[in-house]
Regions:
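N-terminal pre-domain/capping segments
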Residues: 1-231
Length: 232
């Protein structure tokens, strides 16, 4: 088993020397400065790989090579974006980086409701509270039909939370779910963007005609297209 660590590039406050000191062997990272859909060149990959190796570590996993929204919902630019993805995969392989994570969820990449949840021993961690996410989904985002995705008990808890949640907590929830956990991963929404809820809604609207089965079909189409490159 290899001890790996998610590292968010040279701007990460956790540096590679720190990770080496605590026994980390492999790095999980990506080319965070390359816009979604653009090709990861062998030069850019090699540069980051060499930088990581200069600290006695290795680039073990790509997390992630972003799948553009147009690939997921089947937009007109899908074919070109898939071709770019295939080239990026091939370039990673040429550079010896063999494990690549991807995400096919609409709009979101990962969700937490708290990025510094305190624990009794004085430590903190990322945290997901399902009721707070449901509150965000129903009361803040106002997603059409969202109530149907939750139980009566969960809806009751959302109502109870609505009685006590502060405006500051609402803003923190928006910042955590939309900006912090999405922006640095897929670049759709960035720090400083005005009205991130409206931006999030516009992105979500791209999927208004996409049901579960269509999304699965689009995922199958994508995987079928890239698999020959992966197998090489």
């Amino acid at each position: 088993m290899e001890k790996t660590w998610r590292w968010f590039g040279k701007k990460d406050k956790i540096t590679l020397p720190m990770l080496r000191q605590i026994g980390v062997e492999g790095i999980v990272t990506a080319l965070h400065d390359v816009p979604n859909g653009e090709i990861w060149t062998t030069e850019a990959i090699s540069d980051l790989k060499s930088y990581i190796e200069s600290y006695g570590l290795r680039w073990s996993v790509v997390e992630s090579l972003p799948v553009c929204e147009a690939i997921k919902y089947g937009g007109t630019e899908r074919e070109q974006l898939i071709e770019n993805y295939k080239v990026s995969l091939a370039n990673l392989g040429k550079c010896g980086v063999k494990t690549v994570c991807y995400n096919f969820m609409p709009v979101i990449d990962w969700i937490r409701t708290d990025l510094q949840h305190p624990w009794a021993d004085g430590t903190s961690s990322l945290y997901y509270d399902h009721i707070r996410f449901a509150y965000f989904d129903i009361r803040i985002l106002g997603r059409e039909g969202a109530e149907k995705d939750y139980t009566e008990e969960e809806l009751h808890k959302v109502d109870e939370l609505d009685k006590v949640i502060t405006e500051a907590e609402k803003e923190a929830l928006i910042d955590t779910i939309i900006v912090k956990t999405q922006g640095f991963v897929n670049g759709n929404i960035k720090e400083g963007d005005k009205n991130p809820v409206a931006i999030f809604k516009r992105l979500l609207a791209l999927y208004k005609d996409i049901d579960r089965e269509t999304l699965r079909e689009n995922m199958h189409y994508f995987l079928s297209a890239i698999m020959p490159v992966c197998e090489e």
